[in-house]
Curated annotation (Swiss-Prot):
Keywords: ATP-binding, Cell shape, Cell wall biogenesis/degradation, Cytoplasm, Ligase, Magnesium, Manganese, Metal-binding, Nucleotide-binding, Peptidoglycan synthesis
Species in which this protein is naturally found: Polaromonas naphthalenivorans (strain CJ2)
Binding site for Mg(2+) 1: 264, 278
Gene, per the UniProt record: ddl
HAMAP family attached to this UniProt entry: Dala_Dala_lig
Protein name per Swiss-Prot or TrEMBL: D-alanine--D-alanine ligase
Amino acid sequence: MSPNPSSFGKVAVLMGGRSAEREISLMSGSGVVQALRSQGIDAHAFDPAERDLGELKTGGFARCFIALHGRFGEDGTVQGALELLGIPYTGSGVMASSMAIDKVMTKRLLLSESLPTPRYVLLRRGGYSPAQVDAIVDTLGLPLIVKPAREGSSLGLSKVTERAAMAAAVALAEKMDADILCEQFISGDEVTCPVLGTGEQARALPVIRIVAPEGNYDYQNKYFTDTTQYLVPCGLPAGEEAAIQQLVLQAFRTLNCRGWARADVMIDQATRKPYLLEINTSPGMTGHSLVPMSARAAGISYEALCVEVLKTALLDHQPRDGSLP
């Protein structure tokens, strides 16, 4: 049964923000505002880069749909502010958000539960020598991936195919983060799988297989070209897809995520073993975004998806009577 639109109260769609992914967030948020309004919900755009978060309280907002991406949006920062304001919000809580945005912490948590993720080496700004950078090639082999530990949308990511390119790749990643993740490259199918819900009620949506030009699924190919192919149904054997969905649900629960998320996975071409790369706790909602695409394959329209996500808005610390403000 669909909830009465008025039961949501006045909704702020947080969008824009201060991260390197601001442009994408504005695109996501605009789509969400339009979708919620089409369902009769009193939704308003709210850019934390231009307005004080305190206005959410004084403005009478009852809950927030977080369409922010990257720093200050999906890293636990805005979630903590909303906890203090007592305004329920979509997506994961403070701790899960801060863990999931950090690719190294995510890997450590996954490995603690024996979930597969590519081998890696962590570099910290100012804490490594050229010789140590060079040695990473011997440790992980070529090609390998170098990326900032806490950025999304493939920003600052390099695929290193020769030893001489390592220093430049590390320097690029270091411009965006003090922590640099050097990761084993898994050659094979690149897939992604969204999750909707919380706890035991969480469910995995259809897997999407991504085929990018020259295998390069970078920022440009993610959002601004039509040459990347998104295959859903993914074309994998049913058993493989089910195994990926189960693995993604395990990862979602390991990080204590809630509401919704999307996990990126590589499938080793030789062994067909899936490897978890990262979990995005505030996925994109643009025209090129993958969660709406997967939801559509499951029979869920963009508008219905936005309402479904909004219904999951919570606080880490609920009032004693379990009610929402």
